Amino acid sequence: MSQIKPSDIDLSTEICGARQLNVLQRHHMAEPQLDWLAEEVPVALVYNGISHVVMMATPKDLEAFALGFSLSEGIITAPQEIYAIDVTPSCNGIEVNIELSSRRFAGLKERRRAMAGRTGCGVCGIEQLDDIFRPIAPLPFTQTFNLNQLDNALAQLKQVQTVGQLTGCTHAAAWINPQGELLGGCEDVGRHVALDKLLGVRAKQPWQQGAVLVSSRASYEMVQKTAMCGAEILFAVSAATTLAVEVAERYNLTLVGFSKPGRATVYTHPNRIQE
């Protein structure tokens, strides 16, 4: 991918996922100036006519988000189980209508019945601690990554942050190959949404060898989503939580935090990491 610089962006045109507003800057309080802000809108994921969840997201790459979310949440196991995705703006946000296979929709309805009455956060309402861990088969050990290639990948991360370079307001998630080349990526104001978008893109690409690189910290949900989609290595620019490490250990995922030039902290399964 070629390097994108802020100077390469035509600021006279509309940018998907960002818009301009008048603001007042320190030392220039008498003169309003135009500034770019990232968009954050409610996005409803609707499966076979039934609204499943509303997420706050940047309104770009929403088809990839729908596919990646469906995979990382275990609603489907393969892209072919979604027959159609239709993105429709509404007065209050955006609806993403997803047509599921009848088998997967039946499974989703059963899950919704089991979840009835729970609150919105990821862990709240779970009756047993073991319920935090999804029944994901432990990952195989088929991947390796040399940390000498990590700096090259980090230098390319901003390439997928067109909105982020204008606003300073988005997270990035990217797929990097063992040579440290960034093959593709996505951005969003939400780190989980950025990751889901990437996982949706990856599901349609022949990307097998490599790792996930995210610009954020690594929470247990980020680890779980990555493992659910079969990726064996997750690099996070910031730290990992204790639960993220525990989940990564259980699923055989190699988790690396503080992934910065000349630096990396390997938390789990270091046998995949070379130097």
Curated annotation (Swiss-Prot):
Domain of life per record: Bacteria
Amino acids binding Mo-bis(molybdopterin guanine dinucleotide): 258-263
Compartment(s) of residence: Cytoplasm
Protein name as it appears in the record: Sulfur carrier protein FdhD
Keyword Cytoplasm: yes
Main location: cytoplasm
Organism annotation: Yersinia enterocolitica serotype O:8 / biotype 1B (strain NCTC 13174 / 8081)
Lineage: Bacteria, Pseudomonadati, Pseudomonadota, Gammaproteobacteria, Enterobacterales
Family as reported in the entry's similarity comment: Belongs to the FdhD family.
Pfam families recorded: FdhD-NarQ (PF02634)
A molecular-function term among this protein's GO annotations: sulfurtransferase activity
This protein's GO CC annotations: cytoplasm
Residues in the signal sequence: none
InterPro entries: Cytidine_deaminase-like, FdhD
Protein function: Required for formate dehydrogenase (FDH) activity. Acts as a sulfur carrier protein that transfers sulfur from IscS to the molybdenum cofactor prior to its insertion into FDH.
Entry keywords, A to Z: Cytoplasm, Molybdenum cofactor biosynthesis
Catalytic site positions: 121
GO BP term, pick one: Mo-molybdopterin cofactor biosynthetic process
